[in-house]
Amino acid sequence: MAVAQNTGLFAEHGLKSGANMLPLPIEENVFLPFDWGYFAFVYDTSKMATPPASLDALISAKEDIKIAIQDPRTSTPGLGLLLWMKSVYGDDAAAKWQQLQPKILTVTKGWWDAYSLFLEGEADMVLSYTTSPAYHIIAENKNNYAAADFAEGHYVQIELAAMLKSAPQPELARQFLSFMHQQGFQSVIPTTNWMYPVTKTKLPEGFDGLVQPAKSFLFSPDEVAKNQKNWISEWVQSSK
């Protein structure tokens, strides 16, 4: 977010935010949040009766557990896992990545590449979101997918929208951003983007049994902008 803001391409929207359901606060004068979720490892309950209950448990698990994750250089979830590991382990993150390597089946460019491998049975767990099982419950009437609830806590993703300074009709852009916080927009987020709305909205059946992390992690945009390059380099070296 800080990198995007520093380009100077985006204008302050001047709107009063209605995002009262975020698990952690963010500055919203330029970028307006419209949905959010927690990163998590999803598994098939019919194949894995007892999933790891923490990042530590996953890292120290037997090598016959295989996970599919995404590349932090090309994927939002991949970057989310990088920040999650850094939030939990700090300076020890590189060592933890090295310990995790034997469990990593593959690192894909994008979310769907990894998730499809998981659905095909190639991986035991896949990096996704705590809300991913809701799709299977609601759209497919399948109840055998779940997100592992990790004791350390889960990293948050907040999706944002903004208006360009060069927008030919800035008032229409501002009106659309305002519309994104209205009930008509927010109410369809759970069953279209399969994430949580940012305003108080009745959630559909299928969301009520999802994992609710006891602790949330979220670096500030400035922290990510300052450290992202070095943290990715650390991940690359640890993955060799």
What do the PLM-derived regions correspond to, one by one?
Residues 1-123:
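Extracytoplasmic ligand-binding site segments that recognize negatively charged/polar headgroups
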Residues 40-47, 86, 157-169, 188-191:
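A bilobed periplasmic-binding-protein/Venus flytrap-type ligand-binding module shared by bacterial periplasmic
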Residues 54, 96, 159, 168-180, ...:
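Short amphipathic alpha-helical coupling segments at ligand-binding clamshell hinges
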Residues 93, 197-240:
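An extracytoplasmic/periplasmic, membrane-proximal ligand-sensing/linker region
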Residues 1-4, 119, 123-144:
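A ligand-binding cleft/hinge motif common to bilobed small-molecule-binding domains
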